[in-house]
Amino acid sequence: MGETTVLLHTCCAPCSSAIIEALLHSGITPVIYYCNPNIYPFEEYEIRKRECTRYAQSLGLEIVDADYDHDSWLDQMTGLENEPERGGRCLKCFKMRLLRTAQYARERGIKVITTTLASSRWKSLDQINEAGRWACYNLDGTSDLDAGENIPGTSTILPQNEVIWWEQNWRKGGLQERRLQIIKEYDFYNPLYCGCEFRLR
């Protein structure tokens, strides 16, 4: 990859734990970006943020809170309330969160982003990677979240990209096993759903 810093979009401490450890062991320092307007209720959002912060601080890492913007998220999900898991609502949710991640990376001068969502057994890696590529190619935010991928290849890195999407399957390489160990070591709160209120129905 060539970079020593990456902006890591983080959904919760358990999903991020082994990924952060692996990055550090590889000489890469993650800046942890907590951007999760999908999480409901607010108390759940706060618990997950607190656990992410606890883990980041234990490792001396920076964590950035993108603030809770659930109303905007609900507005974007209008009409998708009854979509199944891994359907159109998930893709749009990923796009919204990863676009904000990419835009923040550009503000900070961080060249590479990735997400802990790619460690979740509940989510589609294809959707996550589509959303990540789309976010990095549409940094100006003028493209509608409903638009298609709108980039010329599944793994193309274009010269106009100010931020690059790091496509990585964070479920492999022993990370799932290590994640379970870290959860026990830190006694993390371990969420049993992605955070979306519509998934609870």
What are the roles of these predicted feature ranges?
Residues 1-201:
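Nucleotide-activated chemistry modules centered on ATP-dependent adenylation/adenylyltransferase
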